Amino acid sequence: MPSVEVGGAGGWRPKHLHQQYQPKHHQYHHHYTQQQQQQPPPHPHPPPQPLEIREVWADNVEREFKLIRAAIERFPYVSMDTEFPGVIHHPPPSVHHSTLTPSQRYTLLKSNVDALHLIQVGLAFAASPSSPPALAFQINLREFDPRVHRHAPDSVRLLAASGVDLAAHRARGVSARAFAALLMSSGLVCNPGVAWVTFCSAYDFAYLVKVLMGRKLPRALPEFLRYVRVYFGAAVYDVKHMARVACDSYGEVALLGGLERVAGALRVRRAAGRGHQAASDSVLTWDTFREMARLYFPKEGSLDVCAGVLYGLELPDGGDATTKPAK
């Protein structure tokens, strides 16, 4: 994917999607100095244009993935979100999550993802980094049954209150095996021409890696990150990590928090669906990414420091992920 001039309506574009990624997130203070001109504040946006969310079930999954395969060439920027039944394993009460090292965070993540089932995957597609999403798909999976599978009750109640019909998932949902096969053959994964945008993405990618592998997650964090790189490439942008870079560089503390808070701070409105549904959140993630990139990463190459970094699982250059807690 060629690079383009950045600024104004054009926006940034990943400069070398095919190049070997070298983590550089720890160097961002060298890229954002006190002399750098402050970006304009967020401005109110007009109501977003309505976007249809395409619901994907077992009876139409083949047809919908044909549309996905056809869309990738025109819309190679993909925002992704997942829904799953919460978390059931936590750090000891005396240990705050923020004090865990990346490896300890991954061990906790692995224990949850290995034990639980994916419920929904949302995918939103855009033509360029500055374009609104053109297509959105919500893939509904069938494996999870709250009557027999472990889950966090509060999380499942929240999903139900947000319109997720778990009975319909069990009756009409796509099997994880079928989803994995279609995802592998779709051109979405193992494709260096696709760029991925997420928000606080460690669990999202972990569930997709588990589904694609068809088994439990790798034992160690570096091996897991290698699988993420193989399946999803180097052009992976976690908006929560971007927000932390912007906060550290510009003092924008309003950008710290969950997706709804960050979107609100940027005055980005939800364009489709309801919160806590995967496709709607993937669309909101993309629109939040667009506005954050416009305001805080306007120069060509300025987002390179964020590429390939999953929030909370950051590995410093030459580090071993066992000694440094995440910020």
Predicted regions, residues:
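N-terminal accessory regions of nucleic-acid-interacting proteins
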Residues: 1-115, 126-182, 239
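Metal-dependent phosphoesterase core characteristic of DEDDh/y 3'-5' exonuclease domains
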Residues: 3, 92, 115-121, 126-322, ...
